[in-house]
Amino acid sequence: MSWQTYVDDHLMCDIEGHEGHRLTAAAIVGQDGSVWAQSATFPQFKPEEMNGIMTDFNEPGHLAPTGLHLGGTKYMVIQGEAGAVIRGKKGSGGITIKKTGQALVFGIYEEPVTPGQCNMVVERLGDYLLEQGL
């Protein structure tokens, strides 16, 4: 299965039990910042934004004072799981990033999708990739 298939079929799919509700954008990005696959709507990000995200995984709390930036959009960092999941909020939407052994799984959402639904979609794929040794 290609990485693009994971994005299309497991991240950009309808939310379970909520037909027509789906993430706004999603991607799988290598920890080196290389894009493995992304939705057409995923923002173009800067290397320093990815560096900040990786630093926060290694030093939890690093992004809290400045916020998480991706594609020029600033998200307020909210409670995640140290070293495993970063969550951010902006207005009626937000972002979830799950770290796997080799990659980062990104999900970006807007209402009517809820933070919990985004977390579920992103973390489910991230956990699967971890189980596969990825």
Curated annotation (Swiss-Prot):
One annotated GO molecular function: actin monomer binding
Keyword set, alphabetical order: Actin-binding, Allergen, Cytoplasm, Cytoskeleton, Disulfide bond, Phosphoprotein
SUPFAM superfamilies membership: Profilin (actin-binding protein)
SMART domains membership: PROF
Main location: cytoplasm
Phosphothreonine carried by residues: 114
Alphabetized Pfam families for the sequence: Profilin
Motif Involved in PIP2 interaction per UniProt: ranges: 84-100
Domain of life: Eukaryota
Note in the entry: The variability of the residues taking part of IgE-binding epitopes might be responsible of the difference in cross-reactivity among olive pollen cultivars, and between distantly related pollen species, leading to a variable range of allergy reactions among atopic patients.
Function: Binds to actin and affects the structure of the cytoskeleton. At high concentrations, profilin prevents the polymerization of actin, whereas it enhances it at low concentrations.
Family from the record: Belongs to the profilin family.
Subunit structure, interactors included: Occurs in many kinds of cells as a complex with monomeric actin in a 1:1 ratio.
Protein name per UniProt: Profilin-2
Organism of provenance: Olea europaea
